[in-house]
Amino acid sequence: LAWMKYAYTNYYNMTPKLGQAIVLAGPMGKGKTLFIKKVLGGLFGKEPSDAGNHMVDGTPWTDYVVDSPIMAIDDQEALTSAQQLAKFSAMLKKYVSSEMINYNAKFKQTGQVPWFGRVVIACNTDSESLRILPNMDISNAKKISLFRTSDHRMQFPARETTERLITAELPFLA
């Protein structure tokens, strides 16, 4: 919760600051995507952008990514080579530690824009899914927090009920 409070408080006070990326790893059905889309999206006032196409697949377009304060990489296909992992890890490090991000949209002028958002990665805990984890060398270790969900099976209410509960309770979390 400290990660979220730090990001939200600075965002709310219009004093943006850089912060850590987080990785949420756990079995299917634990609410990782729900947390990213509904809790973080609700707190920050905008649904997280799907950064997988840009950060993992390598598409150059970032206009949709910088449009949201949260970049989400959710159950993305695993990285298949050491070179891809190194590139992904370097990009993640850059987005976490730099105040500027390249802006690139089709048929528009490119440039750099300020971005103080957060990167959130969600993955399952099978060996294939965990291949999305960035390198945790010395330069990245302080920039990324890793969290693992419990293996306890959770029974969520119906989707509409869950979303209604989150909408009702979210103001008290903020």
Indicate residue ranges for each PLM-predicted region.
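Conserved nucleotide-sensing/catalytic segment adjacent to the nucleotide-binding pocket
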Residues: W61-V113
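Alpha-helical scaffold elements adjacent to nucleotide-binding pockets in ATP/GTP-utilizing enzyme cores
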Residues: F35-V39, K87-Y95, S139-K143
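Phosphate-sensing "switch" segment of ASCE/P-loop ATPases
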Residues: V113-R118, R131-A174
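Switch/connector loops and helix/strand junctions flanking conserved nucleotide-binding motifs
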Residues: K32-T33, L79-A82, S127-L133, R153-A158
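Conserved structured core elements
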Residues: L18, T33-L34, A82, A86-S89, ...
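P-loop NTPase catalytic core of nucleic-acid-dependent motor ATPases
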Residues: L1-Q76, S145-R148
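Signature of the SF2 helicase/ATPase Hel1-core->accessory helical subdomain module
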Residues: A90-M100, V119-V120, T125-S127, P134
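A short beta-strand-to-loop transition that corresponds to the Sensor-1 phosphate-sensing loop
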Residues: D75-Q76, A105-K108, F116-S127, R148-H152
